[in-house]
Amino acid sequence: MLQTLDIIKFVFPFVELCMFFCLYRKTYNFMKRFYCNMTLFRNARKFYSLCVLIVLFFINWCCCMTDQNYAVGLSVMMIVLCFSYRVSDYVLSRLKANKVLFFATMVISMISFAIPYLNSLFHVFYTIGIASVFYPSARLLKIPKEEWMAMDKQMIQERILKEYN
């Protein structure tokens, strides 16, 4: 079982990276629906952040079963803090809006990957960084609902795809 957990820990960042390259800013129908739902509905953003946190808990469980150290406890505390939607929304939207903060998060994740006992922190920073890329920008979220309701579905999708960066 430990070998399986080690394989999951090793493969998980590559799966996230492949998802990023295969799905970000693509015009597939399911991605158009995803972008529209994330922009228009708060519950979709809540569900997205909850799914990210559940994946992080699973990866931290894998880290805890293979290497038990204090970094796992620190990463679990960071994840528990993000279970408040306000905190997770703030973190994801700030990482989306501030490119320097996003770059710093990715640099911290790469540094923690290089240090042997900080692998669980790598997974937290890396996953939250990748998840913030798929989060809608503050510019899109500030558009009033009435303006969205005045447009037809095709115009909404085109505008969201154009401004989803």
Predicted segments — roles?
Residues 32-69:
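Membrane-helix boundary elements
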Residues 13, 97-148:
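Alpha-helical membrane-associated segments of multi-pass integral membrane proteins
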Residues 39-45, 94-103:
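Cytoplasmic-side transmembrane-helix entry/capping segments in multi-pass membrane proteins
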Residues 1-10, 57-74, 90-96, 112-127:
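Membrane-helix interface and helix-disruption motif detector
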Residues 140-165:
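Short, highly charged, low-complexity non-transmembrane loops/tails of multi-pass membrane proteins
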Residues 6-32:
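N-terminal signal-anchor/start-transfer transmembrane helix
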Residues 51-61, 78-85, 102-114:
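Hydrophobic, membrane-inserted alpha-helices
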Residues 27-41, 148-157:
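Cytosolic, membrane-interface loops and tails of multi-pass inner-membrane proteins
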